[in-house]
Amino acid sequence: MTDLPASVRWQLWIVAFGFFMQSLDTTIVNTALPSMAKSLGESPLHMHMIIVSYVLTVAVMLPASGWLADRVGVRNIFFTAIVLFTAGSLFCAQASTLDQLVMARVLQGVGGAMMVPVGRLTVMKIVPRDQYMAAMTFVTLPGQVGPLLGPALGGVLVEYASWHWIFLINIPVGIVGAIATLCLMPNYTMQTRRFDLSGFLLLAAGMATLTLALDGQKGLGISPAWLAGLVAVGLCALLLYLWHARGNARALFSLNLFRNRTFSLGLGGSFAGRIGSGMLPFMTPVFLQIGLGFSPFHAGLMMIPMVLGSMGMKRIVVQVVNRFGYRRVLVASTLGLAAVSLLFMFSALAGWYYVLPLVLFLQGMINASRFSSMNTLTLKDLPDDLASSGNSLLSMVMQLSMSIGVTIAGLLLGLYGQQHMSLDAASTHQVFLYTYLSMAAIIALPALIFSRVPDDVGSNTVLRRRNRSGS
C-alpha cells in the first residue's frame, strides 16, 4: 500500500480508527457490569440491558447504513456516525440511572451501526480494486486489536479509576476522528434505488418488540398484558414484512434468498448458533467477579486468551473446513463449544484457576471456527444478484442473535437467582451452575440444524468462492 497517495493512506487510518472504536466498545463494557450495578444501585442481573440496547440498535440500523452512505455521501455519514458514537459515549459517562445509561447506549449503537459498514464502503471507493484486500486487512487489524485490549483495559479503568472512563476514553479519539473525517475524507455518493422504508420499519419493530418481550417481566417489570401486546406487535410486524416482501423486487431483503437451501440452513444455524455464542462473553466476566470474587482487572485479563484463540484459529479455519467439510466442522464445533463451556464452569467451581486460561483459549478457537464456517456456508452458493442482500441480512441476523443471547443469559440468571445473588458463596455457585447447564443445552441445539447440511456441500468451495470474490 506504500504506492497509494498520502491522502488515501490518511483516509484508511480514519476508517481504521472507526473500526477500533467500535470493536473496543463491544468488549470493554462486559468487565465493568458488576461495578456499574453497584454504582447505579441495581442488581447485577439487570445489567445485561446495557449490552442488549447497543447490539439490538446496531442490528436494527444496519440495513439503512449502506443506503444512507450512497445517498448522502460516505464522508457525511461516517462523520455523523463518529459524532453520534462519541456523543453517546459522553451521555453514558454522565448517566446516573440504568435507564439513562440504556438510552445513551442506544444513541451509541446508532453511530456504531453506521461506522463499520460505511467504513468498508469507503475503502471500496477510495482504493484500487487490486489493492482492496491489502487495504481491508490494514483497516480491520485495529478491529481485531480492540477485542483483545477491551476486557483488560476495562478492568484497569474500573479498578483504578471508575467505570465512567470506559466511555470517556472514546471522546478524544472521536473528536480527532470527526475533524479528520471532515478535512481528509472525500464525500462519494452514488445513484441509489428507492429505500424500502416500509420494510425497514416493519423489521425494526419486529426485532425490537420481540427482543424486549423476551426480557419480559423479569428484566423490564412489565405486566403480562403488556408482554402479550409486545409479542403480538412483533409477530404481526414480521408477518406483515413477509406479505410486503412477497413478489416485491424493491424489498429490503428479497424472499428469493430463502429458495437457496444452503443459505436457509446457514442463516438458521447462524441465528441459533450466535444466540449461544453471544451468552459467553457476557456471562464469563460476570461469573468471574460475582461467582469467584475476581477483581475487574483480573477478570479482564482472563478474557484475553479467548480472543487470542479466536485470532489464531482464523489462520487455519479454511484448511480445517477444506479437510473435513462444513457439516462435520459445524456439528463438532457446536457440540465442542457446549462441552467447553461446562468444562470452564466445573474447573472454576473446583478451584482449578490455572486451567481457566487454557479452557478460554480453546473456547475462542472453537468459536472462531464456527463463525467463519457459518458465514461462508450461508453466503457461498448465492448468485451474484443476491449476494449483497444476503450479506446484509446475515450481518443483521448476527447482531440480532447476539442481543437475544445476552437477553436469555440475563433471563436465566434472574430465573435461577431470584434476587439472591448476595447470599453465601455456595448459593451463588449453584445459580451459575444451573445457568451454565442451561446455556450449554442452548449452545448445543444448533447441531441439529447443521446436521442437515448435505454431504454435497463441497469443502473446496470455500477457496473457490474466496478467489472469485477477490478477482
Curated annotation (Swiss-Prot):
Pfam families: MFS_1
Keyword field contains Transmembrane helix: yes
Compartments it resides in: Cell inner membrane
Membrane topology label: Multi-pass membrane protein
Keywords: Cell inner membrane, Cell membrane, Membrane, Transmembrane, Transmembrane helix, Transport
Gene Ontology molecular function terms on file: transmembrane transporter activity
Transmembrane segments: 12-32, 49-69, 77-97, 102-124, 138-158, 165-185, 195-215, 220-240, 263-283, 286-306, 329-351, 393-413, 431-451
UniProt KW Cell inner membrane keyword: yes
Cellular component terms (Gene Ontology): plasma membrane
Family that this chain belongs to: Belongs to the major facilitator superfamily. TCR/Tet family.
HAMAP family per record: MFS_MdtD
Official protein name in the record: Putative multidrug resistance protein MdtD
Lineage of source species: Bacteria, Pseudomonadati, Pseudomonadota, Gammaproteobacteria, Enterobacterales
Gene: mdtD
